[in-house]
Amino acid sequence: MPYFPAVDKVRYEGPDSDSPLAFRHYDADKLILGKPMREHLRMAACYWHTFVWPGADMFGVGTFKRPWQGSGDPLELAIGKAETAFEFFSKLGIDYYSFHDTDVAPEGSSLKEYRNNFAQMIDQLERHQEQTGIKLLWGTANCFSNPRFAAGAASNPDPEVFAYAATQVFSAMNATQRLKGANYVLWGGREGYETLLNTDLRQEREQLGRFMRMVVEHKHKIGFKGDLLIEPKPQEPTKHQYDYDSATVFGFLQQYGLEKEIKVNIEANHATLAGHSFHHEIATAVSLGIFGSIDANRGDPQNGWDTDQFPNSVEEMTLATYEILKAGGFTNGGYNFDSKVRRQSLDEVDLFHGHVAAMDVLALALERAAAMVQNDKLQQFKDQRYAGWQQPFGKSLLAGEFSLESLAKHAFDKDLNPQAVSGRQELLEGVVNRFIYF
């Protein structure tokens, strides 16, 4: 029996449509830069916010009344939840989904129960994928919610907790491989500290490094062809998390020789919590060669926490998509909606309203970003601004042909007196606005 009987399949109706259950800009097969929109964006709906979150917050219990969140046999409820999820994905017309292990299967009271429940639910997910054509963008393991992970998973002071987390990741990686997932994500929700008074930073970093090496080894052992992705976040739930931002993750990966093995999954709201723009985090990851995928959402600038609202800024998403297109587009990654309806959005149709509007935002941003790439005035200005480094003197500097002493002698001999030139920020901001708001 359908859970959303009043909702038909969402279709493209064009910019003049007034329907909140129709796309105004997302025309899945429309060609942009020679490739369909759906292939550029690779959009996914997440299992956890859409079907697991009960509408609770730290001040109140859940406000949603979802049938699968009631009482009953946990496995039967999980099976019903999966049926509802794929009904939603299909009617929404989204191509991908994402999950944590315990989103889709009851955790049980032991590792054996966990393994058996998860195995049965992977059978269910595989069947639904075959029937609907919906694909898995990425899988992951929830190694942060259970009280055993209060002090972390890989960074936990108890090696048995480390082993338990490794077992979950082992299972979730194997499930992702079986379901033909495009990526596997590692979010260190509690890989950090609350206070330095009881924390050995060197010890915990070594544990994290060992854990990630094991993950990489297992990827190659099972022949997983997708990307491994760390998801940076500066804090929350811990006071300080070790995967603070893209640059921090890169330093960690370099330390353990993993910079060619693991990339990043960048979340917009995590970027702003770290004091960065979403644009900054993407550009940084691209420049370091570790860009992988995106969690699309937004935070509230007046709140200092992770609100996970649906993206609604065409400007922000245009600049993000511009950087992604300039880098060659997604390889295995995509735009995963790590977004949730608000606690007062009680009706089932609200799930559609949030996703439809956000998918339209990304589609419009893609069109604007493609126009920027085709007439790349920003790159033209950058080429001009850095032109000196393409001249013989600039090239010799980067090639290491000068020591500090010989370079100082060169400056004295040439009586160098370089002058500042305009960075043209206001001009370039106007250029971007003309592309977005034409």
Curated annotation (Swiss-Prot):
It is an enzyme of class 5 (isomerase). One of its GO terms (cellular component) is cytoplasm. One of its GO terms (molecular function) is xylose isomerase activity. The active site is at H100, D103. Keywords: Carbohydrate metabolism, Cytoplasm, Isomerase, Magnesium, Metal-binding, Xylose metabolism. The keyword Chaperone does not apply. Mg(2+) 1 binds at E231, E267, D295, D338. This is Xylose isomerase. Its main location: cytoplasm. Its EC number is 5.3.1.5. Mg(2+) 2 binds at E267, H270, D306, D308. It is found in: Cytoplasm. Binds 2 magnesium ions per subunit. The keyword 4Fe-4S does not apply. Its cofactor is Mg(2+). Gene3D superfamilies: Divalent-metal-dependent TIM barrel enzymes (3.20.20.150). InterPro entries: Xyl_isomerase-like_sf (IPR036237), Xylose_isom_bac (IPR013452), Xylose_isomerase (IPR001998). The gene is xylA. It comes from Pseudomonas savastanoi pv. phaseolicola (strain 1448A / Race 6) (Pseudomonas syringae pv. phaseolicola (strain 1448A / Race 6)). GO terms for biological process: D-xylose metabolic process. Homotetramer. Coiled coil: none annotated. Belongs to the xylose isomerase family. It catalyses: alpha-D-xylose = alpha-D-xylulofuranose.
